[in-house]
């Protein structure tokens, strides 16, 4: 909807919250230099972590910065060059939700972050399951190769 309405900044805001999982307070950390590097160093509770940017998002952010004439500093800023406030970010996203006929309660940066976290947890759960299945198959193949195709209880029952 944001692209149709030609609200590229709002489109990128939604995308960065949903794909990178950053908080609104971490938005000033999204600078042209850090986007070029492909990861955002953010502080969470005194701890420093790095948020990787997906290549598609990185390309779109760099294109946006180039079109806006930004060579350094924050990617998301007002016409005056100041960083966007929390209320301004939330208001833009909720206006988009209203235009797209999506519940405004679901169109907050916090909800988009929750979407990111839920999606990530689901992907991690799927990867864990695949790793377990792969490990089980590897053990089965190894047992067949060594000749342990039957369990000791099965051998006793066969005699």
Spell out what each predicted region is.
Residues 20, 25-60:
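Conserved tyrosine-mediated DNA breakage-rejoining catalytic core shared by Y-recombinases
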Residues 16-29, 122-125, 134-135:
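A short, glycine-centered helix-capping/turn motif at helix boundaries
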Residues 1-20, 24:
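Basic, Lys/Arg- and aromatic-enriched nucleic-acid-binding interface segment
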Residues 45, 131-159:
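Catalytic-site neighborhood detector that most strongly recognizes the C-terminal catalytic loop/helix
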Residues 54-104:
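Active-site/catalytic core of tyrosine-dependent DNA strand-transfer enzymes
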Residues 1, 75-76, 117:
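Bulky hydrophobic/aromatic "packing anchor" residues in well-ordered structure
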Residues 5-6, 16, 85, 105, ...:
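Residue-level marker of regulatory loop/turn positions in helix-turn-helix DNA-binding domains and
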Residues 91-125, 132, 136, 150:
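Short, basic (Lys/Arg/His-rich) helix/loop patches that form interaction surfaces
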